[in-house]
Amino acid sequence: MKESEILYPSLSLSQYIKYYWVLKTDKIEPVMIQTIPSGCVHLVFHRGENLNIQAKGLQPKNFIRGQFSAYGSLVSAGNIDMIAIIFHPLGLNPFIQCPMSDLYNRYIDIEDLEDIELNHLKNSISSERNVQTCIQFIELFLMKRLIDIDYNHKRVQNSISQIINQPQIEVNTLAESACLGYRQFKRIFTNHVGMSPKEYYRVIRFQRVLYLLQNNPEIEIADLTYSCGFYDPSHLVKDFKEFSGCSPTQYLSSHSPYSTFFSEDCRLNVIKSNRFA
């Protein structure tokens, strides 16, 4: 049995959280899941078996997954009962007391953050079997930590909007729009998002390729190249291989392309649920 459910946050938290993803499975045989850079940070609570990071050992029981710049594989070898909070690009930043750059390419055990309230949330979720009650615990925790967004947060949010809406934009233009020198802009962006603006731009460009392939698998490579802001097809293929491990053609032969960044839903037999009040 496999059950995947998407739950949406309250309106007060919707600018921070894309969705909650609840995944349950009682399969015993190993299942491999490919991971790719998504452009988002995740806060994950395992109530069943931990997933195994191929060649690196088990994931922590409860952790933050920072921005990743490379593909990887997870292996499930037991019952999964997981609640994941999928944040918008800047969504986690206001709620924890560390730069997002410290999370880069890492799974950070919640216990290592020495955050008493977050550890209390972890324990509450571990002992509560009702998913909706767990989501209420999460929302209460986050609502208590809501703070006024600072000016640099707004600057970076505007830069992310430009990256999303203008695939041909030059990264140096982002600094100019923020009225900052590039080095200062890069430092602020990296601390808020978790990777440099150039690298983040490349991840979002890769997610855009997936989204266009998802909606039109027959799209011409030239159209895909231009629409996503690549110099030429070989540039597209090079980046795609770096982030997925294979060329677009190879990927299409073994995967159904899907962008977790640009698409509203998550795959795996999604059951849509109403937002929490």
Predicted regions and their residues:
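Pre-recognition alpha-helix immediately N-terminal to the DNA-recognition helix
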Residues: 158-159, 205-208
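Long, low-complexity intrinsically disordered regions
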Residues: 168, 186-191, 195-201
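Short beta->alpha linker loops
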Residues: 180, 201-204
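A secondary-structure capping/hinge motif
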Residues: 189-195, 239-250
